[in-house]
């Protein structure tokens, strides 16, 4: 009986996907058995960053070089990633959480249901306050939307209240959360969401979660 949960993490280049996984693994690796699979088109840069900066040992981090369009490797033809999952489970039969990070993509990125049990989509304030209302499957269909880099709002003229209003409208009751991962702000809310909705712990919704 399979006992691990696969969490897909997608979003545009530079939004904070790798930073989110790095900080999550730092906080939860002592509590859960965790592994990470990253996707890059031609390099293993994200895997190398996590190996250098994460608390996870190198053998719990695997890089997949997709060699093409990043969303193909997580949706239309997820075979390379599914093989990586199988290899990781063979290495660590006790694994409980496997984070699968997509390559940087646009707002239409979605994971094959065979590859991810739940999905997190990361955008950032620096892209402008209009990003939530642009929609796209990443915004509207992900299980959790993370709006990162709230500290940059004053510098790019973004109104967080407008972003919250638009995210509420586009998400239609699905949760989202504002973060500043550089300072771990609301990281506990993301962890709480994972524990409640991915690991199915009997806990309250995190206070920082918005619907």
UniProtKB/Swiss-Prot annotation:
Keyword set, alphabetical order: Chaperone, Cytoplasm, GTP-binding, Nickel insertion, Nucleotide-binding
Pfam families according to UniProt: cobW
Localization in the cell: Cytoplasm
SUPFAM superfamilies the UniProt entry points to: P-loop containing nucleoside triphosphate hydrolases
GO biological process terms held by the UniProt record: urea catabolic process
Annotated positions binding GTP: 11-18
Nucleotidyltransferase in keyword set: no
Cellular compartments per GO CC: cytoplasm
UniProt cross-references to HAMAP family, sorted A to Z: UreG
Listed PANTHER family: UREASE ACCESSORY PROTEIN G
Function, in words: Facilitates the functional incorporation of the urease nickel metallocenter. This process requires GTP hydrolysis, probably effectuated by UreG.
Subunit note: Homodimer. UreD, UreF and UreG form a complex that acts as a GTP-hydrolysis-dependent molecular chaperone, activating the urease apoprotein by helping to assemble the nickel containing metallocenter of UreC. The UreE protein probably delivers the nickel.
Name of the protein: Urease accessory protein UreG
Organism: Actinobacillus pleuropneumoniae serotype 5b (strain L20)
């Amino acid at each position: 009986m399979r006992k691990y949960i696969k969490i897909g993490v997608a979003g545009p280049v530079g939004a904070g996907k790798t930073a989110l996984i790095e900080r999550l693994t730092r906080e939860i690796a002592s509590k859960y058995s965790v592994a990470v699979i990253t996707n890059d088109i031609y390099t293993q840069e994200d895997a190398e960053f996590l190996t250098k900066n994460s608390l996870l040992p190198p053998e719990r981090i695997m890089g997949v070089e997709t060699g093409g369009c990043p969303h193909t490797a997580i949706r239309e033809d997820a075979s390379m990633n599914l093989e990586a999952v199988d290899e990781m489970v063979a290495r660590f039969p006790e694994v409980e959480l496997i984070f699968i990070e997509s390559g940087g993509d646009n707002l239409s990125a979605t994971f094959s249901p065979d590859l991810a049990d739940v999905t997190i989509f990361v955008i950032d304030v620096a892209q402008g306050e209009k990003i939530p209302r642009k929609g796209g499957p990443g915004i509207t269909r992900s299980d959790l939307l993370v709006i990162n880099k709230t500290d940059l709002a004053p510098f790019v003229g973004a109104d967080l209240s407008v972003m919250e209003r638009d995210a509420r409208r586009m998400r239609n009751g699905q949760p989202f959360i504002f973060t500043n991962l550089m300072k771990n702000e609301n990281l506990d809310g993301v962890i709480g969401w994972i524990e409640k909705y991915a690991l199915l712990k009997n806990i309250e919704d995190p206070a920082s979660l918005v619907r």
